[in-house]
Amino acid sequence: MEKLRKVVNEIAYTRVHTNSPALHRSLVPFLTIASSLYGVALQIRRSLYRYSLLQKHRLPVPVISVGNLSWGGNGKTPMVEYISQFLVDSGLTPLILTRGYAGGDEVKMLERHLRGGPVKIGVGANRAATAALFLDKYGCVDSSSLRSFFDLHERAQVWTISEKIGCIILDDGMQHWSLSRDLEIVMLNGLNPWGNGHLMPHGPLREPLLALERADVAVVHHVDLITKQSLRDIENMIQGFKKSIPIFYSKMVPKYLFDVKNARSHVALEALRCASVLCVSAIGSADAFVKSIEMTGAHYVDRLDFSDHHLFEAEDVETMSRRAKGLEHKSNCKPIIVVTEKDYDRDPEILKCLDSYTVLVLCSELQITPILETDVDSFNYTLMKALAAKFYVSS
């Protein structure tokens, strides 16, 4: 099954299959049919909401949706964390609503990062029902209080944070149409935003690119890893669907590492300098992870990629060990195995089985990158403006 997932992923990011292996070419017709059926189902579902045959729920506090058009590597979860922390720093308690699917690695990572703070995380497929449970339990900041909050924020004065929920963040919300939102943020993987341009499963697209028209803000992620020409091409594509959309830029900045045997340990990035490193990951954009390790100054970098959200098993650990031994033979030194936080949070215990090697977890954080007239201040202003607009308050 893992091999099939990897093959489908390779097909999704390949535009021409003339030189592809026979297995890839044999699957393309079936994937094309499946994509057509998926597209029809998507149109029907969208129409049901458009004509109010399916109900949209309006929540009593501002809602920010963070989503994407394609699977994996778009920076969606780091952006959710960034917005959560910004809201807390501003004095509002956010509630993150997430499905928590595919092993729940993203939820576990958010819980670990945000533990001890006021941020609340609601997990469930029915996000309207999950929101109702949290709003009943904690209450919400009423409109008059939010007006006071925006007034104080405009004057750069402090607002005292409370347990009451002041904003809701929809994690992976772009295709979750049952909840109305006040700001729609679409995240795009700058390394390969559209893949082969087809809908799933033939391609990586969860919706046609026309869905960019619904977005209020576009964020190009991994902007530090792409060329200026690639960035211009992405901007032109986005603005071809919505000329007026503000475009921001983000990147993942490595901060430190920790040992899988001690999550409280703190290992400096310099530990990888001049070292042999085996990058092991089961994430949506392994290329970005590997490039970030290369930029630490590692002497030799090898990689072992699994499909997104893959749950490591004993045979995978054996594969990692064999690959590490091969790297040790090539480089004449014992390699360090590095994984991502999502891989660690998916199953922290199984990685401890690699006891013959040092296994480190790379910790990174999302940063808004200043390009042209956009920077972190203008992005934060956009967030506040959207929240204030719900109550017709000028921010």
Curated annotation (Swiss-Prot):
Catalytic activity: a lipid A disaccharide + ATP = a lipid IVA + ADP + H(+)
GO cellular component: membrane; mitochondrion
Domain of life from the UniProt record: Eukaryota
Molecular function GO terms recorded: ATP binding; tetraacyldisaccharide 4'-kinase activity
Transit peptide start and end: 1-32
Annotated keywords: ATP-binding, Kinase, Lipid A biosynthesis, Lipid biosynthesis, Lipid metabolism, Mitochondrion, Nucleotide-binding, Transferase, Transit peptide
Pathway, per record: Glycolipid biosynthesis; lipid IV(A) biosynthesis; lipid IV(A) from (3R)-3-hydroxytetradecanoyl-[acyl-carrier-protein] and UDP-N-acetyl-alpha-D-glucosamine: step 6/6
Disruption phenotype: No visible phenotype under normal growth conditions, but plants lacking LPXK accumulate high levels of disaccharide-1-phosphate (DS-1-P).
Enzyme Commission number(s) from the entry: 2.7.1.130
GO terms, biological process: lipid A biosynthetic process; lipid X metabolic process
Cellular compartments annotated: Mitochondrion
Broad class of enzyme this protein falls into: transferase
InterPro entries assigned to the protein according to its UniProt record, in alphabetical order: LpxK
Protein family (similarity comment): Belongs to the LpxK family.
Reported function: Involved in the biosynthesis of lipid A, a phosphorylated glycolipid that in bacteria anchors the lipopolysaccharide to the outer membrane of the cell. Transfers the gamma-phosphate of ATP to the 4'-position of a tetraacyldisaccharide 1-phosphate intermediate (termed DS-1-P) to form tetraacyldisaccharide 1,4'-bis-phosphate (lipid IVA). Lipid A-like molecules in plants may serve as structural components of the outer membranes of mitochondria and/or chloroplasts, or may be involved in signal transduction or plant defense responses (Potential).
PANTHER family according to UniProt: TETRAACYLDISACCHARIDE 4'-KINASE, TETRAACYLDISACCHARIDE 4'-KINASE, MITOCHONDRIAL-RELATED
Record's protein name: Probable tetraacyldisaccharide 4'-kinase, mitochondrial
Species annotation: Arabidopsis thaliana
